Curated annotation (Swiss-Prot):
PROSITE patterns: RIBOSOMAL_L14. Pfam families: Ribosomal_L14. GO terms for cellular component: chloroplast; cytosolic large ribosomal subunit. Belongs to the universal ribosomal protein uL14 family. It is found in: Plastid, Chloroplast. One of its GO terms (molecular function) is large ribosomal subunit rRNA binding. InterPro entries: Ribosomal_uL14, Ribosomal_uL14_bac-type, Ribosomal_uL14_CS, Ribosomal_uL14_sf. One of its GO terms (biological process) is translation. Gene3D superfamilies: Ribosomal protein L14 (2.40.150.20). It comes from Fagopyrum esculentum subsp. ancestrale (Wild buckwheat). Keywords: Chloroplast, Plastid, Ribonucleoprotein, Ribosomal protein, RNA-binding, rRNA-binding. This is Large ribosomal subunit protein uL14c.
Length: 122
């Protein structure tokens, strides 16, 4: 469960290391975002000499949460961290690599490019 002011790790090589959520897209009064939701975030920590800089406002899709994700078959998945992948306005990832495992639910939400870049899909 991600809400405004939550810090997230960045799971790609776009140049940012840490994000802070400032808004959940498509939710006027929704409090929490889950895996597959798009958020507006600000970069809190970035790698020097990369295209993305600190305090830049970007969009990202959540790929991992510490809150459990329950599937229809009864399986429960929980990750070790909260992580997101930075995307552009069309929904394509800004980085060329994705680090760590991501949830299968992203494929159903039409983030197929992110799923194809991921080393492991759970």
């Amino acid at each position: 469960m991600i809400q405004p002011q939550t810090y997230l790790n960045v799971a790609d090589n776009s140049g940012a290391r840490e994000l802070m959520c400032i808004r959940i897209i498509g939710a006027s009064n929704r409090r929490y975002a889950h895996i597959g939701d798009i958020i507006v975030a600000v970069i809190k920590e970035a790698i020097p000499n990369m295209p993305l800089e600190r305090s830049e406002v970007i969009r990202a899709v959540i790929v991992r949460t510490r809150k459990e994700l329950k599937r229809e078959n009864g399986m429960i998945i929980r990750y070790d961290d909260n992580a997101a992948v930075i995307i552009d306005q069309k929904g394509n990832p800004k980085g060329t690599r994705v680090f760590g495992a991501i949830a299968r639910e992203l494929r159903q939400l039409n983030f197929t490019k992110i799923v194809s870049l991921a080393p492991e899909v759970l």
